[in-house]
């Protein structure tokens, strides 16, 4: 039986092209088309789709408002189509905060031309969310503030920013801890934390980073699969929500302790240097069959392994595909510890599963448990 899809967009051309693309895959069936958010709410209630594709800008009711109402009344996986502008990036992040599970850039030219990479991307993203119907997160879940954890080497930083409630990305009733470990810190020496993620990552990263205290004594390197126009807005949002400084990494910038660096979208990020000084190399890489992502977790993690050797806690969060497996393997070979997000709390279990199946990961946690275990391990 085919998965049922509801397509929501005020453009009849875009709706029809999305329908044609999705139905090229026999496992996908578009059962309805809505012109605005209000129609989407009504059709979700009557048609029971497995997944909804949602535009942001629409008359009568916009996509963000519709997402909030759908997630409050009848939760269903939603994938947003967003313009590649700063405004579009901010709107998409709002939609993800409201409960949407994923997003895709809205590129009319790719859709119109029926480009095979665009076709494959849309079909794969929609099918991944169809498979993740169970265990939907609600629009918002209040999260208790983390207990204070003191580090031996406080770092200087700007005055603490305002605190806000984080949005949970795990289903209600999910266990908080899945590792067989007792949770006792290993006592290992660390010099940095490295995180790789893709689908579902924005909410997962927000959950983890908002729990990190301002005196965290190590740099944090983050690779999130995102378009170039999105990462700056995402870094700014995380910076507002977090106690520590979060910023988009810049070429040649010196790495500082207590700062979280987000890899710029559409480019590659590596670190270079020695024990005295580490800096970033941000560069444009040609398209390659071997490198599917910009930024790429494997590339960043490999450079971290070269500079920091085994003094690293490597984390792979929710995401599609297997990016991060090779990089995590290189970190592991140097003596680093590798943890992954569990299947139940992952929006898509592809990246964590690839690392688990390769025998690289030592521990597996739900996203709700990650923050406390990271802080305990690295304290």
From Swiss-Prot:
PTM section of the record: Phosphorylated by CheA. Phosphorylation of the N-terminal regulatory domain activates the methylesterase activity.
Superkingdom, natural source: Bacteria
InterPro entries: CheB-like (IPR008248), CheB_C (IPR035909), CheY-like_superfamily (IPR011006), Sig_transdc_resp-reg_Me-estase (IPR000673), Sig_transdc_resp-reg_receiver (IPR001789)
Key words of the record: Chemotaxis, Cytoplasm, Hydrolase, Phosphoprotein
Subcellular locations according to the entry: Cytoplasm
Response regulatory domain span: 4-121
Similarity section: Belongs to the CheB family.
NCBIfam families reported in the protein's UniProt record: PRK00742.1
Annotated domain remarks: Contains a C-terminal catalytic domain, and an N-terminal region which modulates catalytic activity.
Stated name of the protein: Protein-glutamate methylesterase/protein-glutamine glutaminase
Organism: Pseudoalteromonas atlantica (strain T6c / ATCC BAA-1087)
Gene that specifies this protein: cheB
């Amino acid at each position: 039986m085919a998965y049922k899809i509801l397509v929501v967009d005020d453009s009849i051309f875009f709706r029809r092209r999305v329908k044609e693309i999705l139905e090229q895959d026999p496992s996908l069936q578009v059962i309805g088309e809505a012109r605005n958010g209000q129609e989407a709410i009504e059709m979700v209630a009557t048609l029971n789709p497995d997944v909804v594709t949602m535009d942001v800008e629409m008359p009568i009711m916009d996509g963000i408002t519709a997402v909030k109402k759908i997630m409050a009344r009848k939760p269903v996986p939603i994938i947003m189509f967003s313009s590649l502008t700063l405004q579009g990036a901010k709107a998409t992040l709002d939609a993800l905060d409201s409960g949407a599970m994923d997003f895709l850039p809205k590129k009319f030219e790719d859709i119109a031309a029926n480009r095979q990479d665009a076709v494959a991307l849309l079909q794969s993203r929609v099918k991944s969310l169809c498979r993740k119907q169970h265990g939907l997160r609600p629009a918002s879940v209040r999260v208790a503030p983390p207990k204070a954890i003191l580090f031996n080497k406080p770092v200087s930083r700007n005055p603490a920013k305002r605190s806000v409630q984080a949005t949970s990305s795990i289903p209600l009733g999910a266990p908080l801890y899945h590792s067989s470990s007792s949770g006792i810190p290993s006592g290992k020496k660390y010099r940095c934390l490295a995180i790789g993620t893709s689908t579902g990552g924005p909410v997962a990263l927000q959950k983890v980073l908002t729990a990190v205290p301002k005196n965290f004594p190590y740099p944090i390197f983050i690779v999130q699969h995102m378009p170039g126009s999105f990462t700056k807005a995402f870094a700014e949002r995380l910076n507002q929500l977090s106690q520590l400084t979060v910023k988009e990494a810049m070429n040649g910038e010196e790495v500082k302790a207590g700062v979280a660096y987000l890899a710029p979208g559409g480019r590659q990020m590596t670190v270079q240097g020695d024990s005295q000084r580490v800096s970033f190399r941000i560069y444009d890489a040609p398209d390659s069959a071997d490198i599917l992502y910009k930024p790429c977790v494997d590339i960043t993690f490999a450079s971290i392994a070269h500079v920091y050797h085994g003094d690293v806690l490597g984390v792979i969060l929710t995401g599609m595909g297997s990016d991060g497996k090779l990089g995590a393997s290189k970190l592991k070979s140097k003596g680093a510890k590798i943890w992954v997000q569990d299947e139940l709390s992952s929006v898509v279990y592809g990246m964590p599963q690839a690392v688990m199946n390769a025998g690289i990961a030592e521990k597996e946690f739900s996203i709700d448990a990650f923050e406390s275990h990271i802080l305990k391990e690295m304290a």
